[in-house]
Structures are given as C-alpha cells and as structure tokens.
Swiss-Prot record:
Catalytic activity: tRNA(Gly) + glycine + ATP = glycyl-tRNA(Gly) + AMP + diphosphate
GO molecular-function term, one example from the UniProt record: glycine-tRNA ligase activity
InterPro entries: DALR_anticod-bd, Gly-tRNA-synth_bsu, Gly-tRNA-synth_heterodimer
Record-linked SUPFAM superfamilies: HD-domain/PDEase-like (SSF109604)
The protein, known as: Glycine--tRNA ligase beta subunit
Domain of life where this protein originates: Bacteria
Keywords (A to Z) from UniProt: Aminoacyl-tRNA synthetase, ATP-binding, Cytoplasm, Ligase, Nucleotide-binding, Protein biosynthesis
Oligomeric and partner information: Tetramer of two alpha and two beta subunits.
E.C. code: 6.1.1.14
Gene Ontology biological process terms, A to Z: arginyl-tRNA aminoacylation; glycyl-tRNA aminoacylation
C-alpha cells in the first residue's frame, strides 16, 4: 500500500485564546475518529494551533481503503424456496438487491440451519475523495458554544474563516470547508514575514510558516520558548517569574511569534497588597509577575509581545504606561478602604441580600459566627476567635478593592484584619474561609481557619437545601457540590472528630424559621453520602469498597475514611473473597427469617464440630475486637476477622443451618447473626466483588 502525509489547516480571524487548545485537540481527535470509521490506517496525528489557525498533520495515511469481502446473508433455505424448489419472492428480492440471481447465491451452513449467502467484493475508495467530508464532520463536532455568522454567508463557526488548505503530500485535495474552497494559500504573520504564500507539500507546513510567514504554528514549541525565555529574563533581574500554567497557556494562544520582554513599575505600588497587584497584572494585562527568592513581589513584570521590534524599549514603555493606571487604581482603593475597619462595615452588610428566603449577608455572618464558635468548642479551638472570624468573614465584600477585584474576597479581608489589629489567626481565617476553591486546592489546617471554612460551607448547604433548592442534574448555581466536598476534605485531611449529623442539626437550628423544607437535614446528609462516593472514586478507590462502607452510613468523615482504608486493605487479603461470599450467603439466609432472631448462642445446642469451632473462634476474638472497634481501628479488627475463613468454610460445608429441629436452627441463626454483626461493625463486606 502507498502512504502520504496529510495537512489540513483552517485559517481564521483571532480565535478565543482560552479555547484554542481544546479546539485544536478536538479537531484532530474528531478527524482521526473519522479515519478509523472509514478503516483508513495512519501512523500518528499531531495538532497545531496559533491565534489565527487550527491545523493538524496525519502521518503515513494510507491512500486508499483496502478491498474487502462483505458477507450478506439472505433468507433461510426453508423460506427461500417453495415446495417445488422454486425461489420465493423473499429470495428473489434479496438477490435482486445484491445484484445477483438466486442461482448465483452461495449456501451458508451452520448448526442452526442453512441460508442463502452472497460474498460481495467491496472495492476500497481513494482516501483523497473522503477527506473533505471527514474534515467537515470533524469541524461540525467542535465544542463551540456560540458560533457566529459573517458576511452574507449562512455558514457558522467560532470565528470568520479566510483560508482552507488540504494537502495530501504535494497534491491539493479539492473541496470546501465552512464555505471556503481548499487552496495552497497559507497566511503568515500580520506584521512580519510574508502576508501569504503557497505551500507545496504537507511536510513543509511548520518550516514554511516559520521561515516565510514568521509564525510558529507548533503550539508546544511556542509555549516552551515563552517559558524558557521568561525564566531567563526573571533570573537576569534576580527574580523568579510566576508562570502559572493557565496564564502561560493563554499567552501562548495569543501570539504567533513570541518575544519575551521585561518591564518595571514604581516601587511605591509595593505598599499595596501583592495579591491585588498580581491580580491586575495577570488577569487584566496577561503579564507574568516576578518575585524574589523569598516570595516577595518585585517591581518588575515580564510580558510577551507578538512582534520583533527594532526598538523594544518603545514596546516596554507602552506596556508600563498601560499598567500604571491599573496599579494606581488598586493603590487608591486600598488607601480608601483602610479608612474603615472591617467591624464598622458590618452594618452595611444589612443592605445586601444573601438569598431572599435566607436573609441578608449580615444575618449570614451572624450564623457563621455562632456555628464557627460551636465547631471550635468541638475541636478544642478558641471559640471566641472562631466566632470573631466568622463575624468579620464577609465584611471585605463592602470594600472598594473587592468590588473592583472580586476574586480577592477573603484575601483582602486578611490584609484589612491585620491593619485593624485583629489576631493573626482571625486574619488568616478570613483568607482561607473559601478553601478548597477548586479540585486539587489545599484545605485550611489552622484551627480557626478550619472552623470558619466549615461554618461558611455548612450555612450555605443547609440553607439552600432548607428552602428546597437542591442541585438538579448538572445545575448547581450555589456550588453546593464543591461546598460538600470541601466540608468532607477539611474533616478528613485534618482528622477532625466531627459528625455530619451534629453539624447539620446545629446549622439548621441557626437558620431558625427561614427554612421551609422539613426534610432538609435528611437530604443534606444524603447529599454528603453521594459526595463521599464521588470523592473516593476520584481517589481511585474501588466502587465495591465504597458501597460496603456506605451501607453502614457512618456520618463522621474521619470515621468513614478509616473504614474505607480498612476495607480496601481487607479486600487485598487472600481470605477476603471467601469471607465476602460467606457474608453474602449469611445475609441472604438471615433476610429470609421471619420474626425476631435469637441473640443468645447456647453452647448446649452446638452439636456439630464445625459449629462448635466457629462459636469458639468468635468467643476468642470478641474480647480483642471490642476495643479495636471502639477505637475505630477497623483495619486491625478486619485482619483478625480474616482468620475466621477456615472456620466459616467448614461450617457451611458440614452444618445444615435450617435444621428441622427448631432449637438447633435458631441457635445456628444466632451464631451466623453474631458472625455477621462483627463484620458489620466496620462495613458490609458482602458487597465486595
């Protein structure tokens, strides 16, 4: 077979930078899916992307489909011919549809009977004739939430399309994508190199764009250049650049020919909290801040321009001029905000509604304050400090800085609290109350921070469920799933002795008459159980292990975690499979018993050696198991119970549980119930697979 390399490029106006990678990855993925459906082999595929182009190359693409034979089964012989051996209408219709006569059909014999058969030879189609339609389908499936139209065309895409190039080796693939005909024309950089040029071969795409068009279409190469040059530029001024990957990706998606430059701002702005300056530089201007080795912000920033200038200082001065007013605004807001304390802003929180049925933010912070103090008492933290932090937790929402830079809520509260003379624990708690903010974020560990973060989330969860607005489907406007995961993670990772039932009840009590859903507490607890499952699945824990623990519905997160670890360890033991099966058998037997089960085991009614041995083994273990379960040492307890395997196996081999003698039967059921209860102290291991 013959092979060639394929290039497809769609030249557009500037694409959304935050979507560029996803669009490019989806484009090539959709196309390779089409190739596989068409049974066209290839060696590899690589996406390319720049602000004004989506492209990919497919290496060693076969030039035609392979010929193949397709078996087309017809009617069974009994239905294909009548009693006189003449073809029926069914047989003739099938043959006509396949372009043959009934006499030309073969016979297919199987164990189930005999059928007419036609082995049709299907000649493979040239790849070139399939490419256009496959590329169009790949584009149609791109994740574009808001497509747009341009000109007089009815075609829709994420941005207007100007060029389309499809080359199979050196051959132009005729066709049209998004209303634009395929041609060899490739557009270069807007301001450097050739405005456009013709590409002679798919293999020359990247090199021709770089040399003639002054465009680096290799996304990863462009990103690597920016990262390397920015690190070098920061080191040159004695600092370290903050090259957060999300911003690095966005900047990579904004430039075709990256040139890294260093600029400065006045040192006086360093009196403003660094987070505000960084927020402005990164969020508004797409600049990389520079820190010293101690983590202190330096009066420099690194930025990436899309052009090689004969006088870079002009570009540097321009960027310094642009950022200065933004930093001056931050300075003004900070100086203005300092004139009022966080406590003095509490009254203004009365004017802001948190949620119509749940009251104002002032009422919310009063609830958070009381709940944080309650939690503090439960974990031996300072209740007064926790209550104080809860009370001040939302005051920074009324500051100029947070109104302008909303993502700084909490962070600015910390800075203002320090200026107001609050304790460091209170100040830090204001900053950490929203943690964890996203998957993978750290959780607060300082006691006061823990109390406020838990109270803040529990107030929201219980309140929103309490007015009947639980999340439905994918919709979660109050981010309750994130809040619930946050509560669980804070409790788990700090090993806190807290119970969800107690926390929910206290939060519900503090909401008072605001709540109209009388099943709120039950629903919130069930919601937490669902988050337990989601969280542990994300951590790679087997579903059957999670279900085994969920069956016991432990409501203390730290206890839940201990059980998960213990059952996961038990599952790895050699005895686990047999004991899980035995527990399932016991569960089924006990479920069929009518009336109340006996709880006392009579030694006089133990007549078989196997039941005597099992009872004796259980009696030996119980004094060891009781303190282990009391201390939540489930792993050691289950390891001891694993030693019962042989006794349990022998019992089921030698003993008839449902004996005719009622007394013997009830005694054996009591023995099995006792066995199962020991395992149920940890989990329902009958659910292990």
């Amino acid at each position: 077979m013959n092979y060639e390399n394929l290039l497809i490029e769609v030249g557009t106006e500037e694409l959304p930078p935050k979507a560029l990678r996803k669009l490019a990855e989806s484009f090539v993925s959709n196309f390779t899916d089409e190739l596989e459906k068409a049974e066209l082999s290839f060696e590899s595929a690589q996406w390319h992307a720049a602000p004004r182009r989506l492209a990919f190359t497919v290496n060693q693409l076969v030039l035609a489909q392979a010929d193949k034979v397709v078996e087309k089964r017809g009617p069974a012989i009994a239905q294909a011919f009548d009693a006189d051996g003449n073809p029926t209408k069914a047989a003739m219709g099938w043959a006509r549809g396949n372009g043959i006569s009934v006499e030309q059909a073969e016979r297919l014999k199987t164990d189930k009977g005999e059928w007419l058969l036609h082995q049709a030879k299907v000649v493979g189609v040239e790849t070139k004739s399939l490419i256009n339609d496959m590329a169009q389908r790949a584009l149609d499936k791109l994740p574009i939430p808001k497509p747009m139209r341009w000109g007089t065309s009815k075609t829709q895409f994420i941005r207007p399309v100007h060029t389309v190039t499809m080359l199979l080796g050196s051959e132009l693939v005729e066709g049209e994508l998004l209303g634009v005909k395929s041609a060899r024309v490739i557009r270069g950089h807007r301001f450097m190199g050739k405005k456009s040029f013709e590409l002679d071969h798919a293999d020359n795409y990247l090199s021709a764009l770089k040399e003639q068009g002054m465009v680096l279409a290799d996304y990863e190469a462009r990103k690597a250049i920016i990262k390397t040059d920015a690190e070098a530029a920061a080191a040159k001024i004695g600092g370290v650049a903050d090259l957060e990957d999300d911003l690095l990706e966005e900047v990579t998606s904004l430039v075709e020919w990256p040139v890294v430059l260093t600029a400065n701002f006045e040192e006086k702005f360093l009196d403003v909290p660094a987070e505000a300056l960084v927020y402005t530089m990164k969020g508004d201007q797409k600049y990389f801040p520079v820190f010293d080795k101690a983590g202190q912000l330096l009066p420099h920033f690194i930025f990436v321009t899309n052009i090689e200038s004969k006088d870079p200082q002009v570009i540097i001065s321009g960027n310094e001029k642009v950022v200065r007013p933004r930093l001056a605004d931050a300075e003004f807001f900070f100086e203005t905000d300092k004139k009022q304390t966080l406590e003095s802003r509490l009254a203004s929180l009365e004017t802001v509604v948190f949620q119509k049925q749940l009251g104002t933010i002032k009422q919310r912070v009063e609830r958070i304050s009381q709940l944080a103090g309650y939690i503090a008492a439960s974990i031996d933290a300072d209740s007064d400090e926790a209550s104080r932090a809860g009370l001040l937790s939302k005051s920074d929402l009324m500051t100029n800085m947070v109104m302008e830079f909303t993502d700084l809520q909490g962070t600015m509260g910390m800075h203002y609290a320090r200026l107001n003379g609050e304790t460091e624990a209170v100040a830090v708690a204001l900053a950490e109350q929203y943690k964890p903010k996203f998957s993978g974020d750290t959780v607060p560990t300082a006691p006061i921070s823990v109390c406020v973060a838990l109270a803040e989330k529990l107030d929201t969860l219980v309140g929103i469920f309490g007015i009947g607005q639980a999340p439905k489907g994918a919709a979660d406007p109050f981010a309750l799933r994130r809040a619930a995961i946050g509560v669980l993670r804070i409790c788990l990772e700090n090993n806190l002795p807290l119970d969800l039932v107690d926390l929910i009840a206290k939060a519900q009590e503090l909401h008072g008459d605001n709540l109209t859903n009388d099943k709120a507490a039950e629903q919130v607890l069930e919601f937490f159980m669902g988050r337990f499952r989601a969280w542990y699945q994300d951590q790679g824990v087997s579903v059957d292990v999670i279900l085994a623990v969920l069956a016991r519905r432990p409501t203390a997160p730290a206890d839940f975690d201990s059980r998960i670890k213990a059952v996961a360890h038990f599952r790895s033991l050699e005895q686990a499979s047999a004991l899980a099966a035995a527990n399932k058998r016991v569960s089924n037997i006990l479920a069929k018993v009518e009336g109340e089960l006996a709880t006392d085991i009579s030694s006089e009614l133990l007549v078989e050696n196997a039941e005597k041995a099992l009872a004796e083994k259980l009696n030996e273990l119980q004094p060891q198991l009781a303190p282990l379960f009391a201390a939540a040492n489930y792993q050691q307890a289950l390891s001891l119970l694993a030693d019962l395997r042989e006794s349990v196996d022998t019992f089921f081999e030698d003993v008839m549980v449902m004996a005719d003698d009622e007394a013997l039967k009830n005694n054996r059921l009591a023995l099995l119930s006792s066995l199962r209860e020991q395992f149920l102290h940890a989990a329902d291991i009958s659910l292990l697979q």
